[in-house]
């Protein structure tokens, strides 16, 4: 397959993201401004809501024609409404009744007003592939080969096999200055560091996408090194980060280090040229609970692939339960940025949402009543999820079951 342009991890938290609409100008009427149509450039799913924006001119009627020029849908535009943010007025053409796959054009007042657009069950398949491939481009600790990365091939950087324990992350089993290994994982959106808290919601997004739509993702070929093995590519990609996350747990007490970073951000250099000392920094309740939630759902979803990942489901379950126990014993440890550390903080001081999410995932994994009771104690009405607000993720997982 072709190599998509790399995107940041943060930009693809939702694999259902819409693309920007593109305008197409039709022939101008005898008087008045030219009409412009803004329509999804990738197309529409057959059963989906389908809208186009019509700007300019006193247009009133629209029709959709197929590739043979036959009119397949007619409609009347409502009055235009003004959107102050853009300073423009537009009317909305509702094309939702169009459900037969094919390629079409939208005409406004009899003039051809749009480039062809598609109605196709696979309209967003390429978008999903590109969004998933973005995670590959953000892999740490590995070279990106031309066969998989095309013009974005690069040497390996940040092996992270000798990471120093910062004083803020020290414990009896891992004193300050000792060294641990935590390779792989994904770089953050704008730097070469790796953070458990926001990495957690990114990994969960991939795992949830697989759980909700296995038939769609089972056949995707992302052109990553693991493509063609017996595991769906979306799970192979998530595993790259799960392996790193497992290394972020302090085996001595079950707590989870908040981040693996330099003391300061790297400059604008390629990964192999960024060679500053790397540190495990901090421990906190949010990191432990996000880790527990991700490991719990991963334990469930990788169980059918035990042959490819021997021992991993049991290991992830044990890791999730250990992190939960640590969080129960340390329920309010907020991450505080040490004075000598100047990378992303990703701090949080309210943990009900993390407790609810982790409890939901552990309940689905184990069926144990203690986790359901914990979910009931901590759950709130779901809001829009983000790295700092993850309560809705537990609701999503529970609703699916």
Which stretches of residues belong to each language-model region?
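N-terminal secretory signal peptides that target proteins for export/translocation
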Residues: 1-9
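Bacterial N-terminal signal peptides
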Residues: 11-24
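Boundary at the C-terminal end of the N-terminal hydrophobic targeting segment
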Residues: 25-30
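Glycan-recognition and catalytic cores of secretory/periplasmic carbohydrate-active enzymes
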Residues: 32-36, 61-90, 99-101, 105-108, ...
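Contiguous beta-strand segments within globular domains
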Residues: 33-57
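Beta-strand secondary-structure signal
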Residues: 51-53, 92, 105
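Short, flexible loop/turn segments at beta-strand junctions in immunoglobulin-like
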Residues: 95-97
């Amino acid at each position: 397959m072709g190599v998509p342009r790399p995107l940041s991890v943060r930009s693809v938290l939702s694999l259902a993201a819409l693309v920007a609409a593109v305008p197409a100008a039709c022939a101008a009427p005898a008087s008045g401004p030219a009409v412009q149509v803004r329509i999804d450039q990738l197309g529409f799913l057959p059963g989906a809501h389908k809208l186009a924006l019509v700007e300019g001119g006193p247009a009133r009627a629209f029709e959709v024609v197929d590739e043979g020029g036959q009119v397949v849908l007619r409609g009347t535009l409502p009055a235009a409404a003004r959107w102050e943010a853009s300073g423009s007025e537009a009317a909305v053409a509702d094309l939702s009744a169009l459900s037969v796959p094919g390629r079409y054009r939208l005409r406004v007042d009899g003039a051809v007003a749009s480039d062809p657009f598609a109605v196709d069950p696979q309209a967003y398949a390429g978008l999903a592939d590109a969004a998933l491939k973005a995670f590959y481009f953000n892999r740490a600790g590995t070279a990106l080969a031309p066969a998989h990365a095309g013009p974005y091939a690069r040497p390996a950087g940040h092996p992270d096999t000798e990471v120093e324990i910062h004083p803020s992350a020290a414990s009896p089993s891992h004193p300050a200055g000792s060294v641990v290994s935590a390779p792989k994982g994904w770089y953050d959106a704008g730097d070469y560091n790796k953070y458990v808290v926001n990495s957690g919601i990114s990994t969960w997004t991939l795992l949830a996408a697989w759980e909700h739509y296995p038939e769609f993702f089972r056949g995707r070929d992302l052109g990553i090194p693991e493509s063609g093995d017996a595991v769906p590519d979306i799970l192979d990609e998530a595993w790259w980060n799960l392996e790193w996350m497992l290394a972020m747990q302090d085996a001595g007490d079950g707590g989870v280090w908040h981040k693996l970073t330099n003391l300061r951000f790297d400059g604008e250099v390629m990964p192999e040229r960024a060679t500053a000392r790397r540190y495990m920094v901090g421990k906190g309740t949010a990191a432990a609970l996000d880790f527990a939630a991700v490991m719990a759902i991963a334990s469930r979803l990788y169980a059918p692939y035990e042959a490819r990942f021997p021992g991993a489901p049991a290991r992830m379950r044990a890791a999730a339960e250990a992190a939960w126990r640590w969080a129960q014993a340390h329920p309010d440890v907020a991450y505080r940025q040490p004075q000598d550390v100047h990378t992303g903080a990703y701090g949080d001081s309210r943990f009900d949402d993390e407790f609810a999410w982790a409890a939901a995932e552990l309940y689905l994994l184990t069926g144990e009543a203690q986790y359901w009771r914990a979910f009931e104690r901590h759950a709130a009405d779901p809001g829009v999820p983000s790295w700092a607000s993850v309560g809705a993720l537990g609701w999503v997982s529970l609703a699916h079951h």
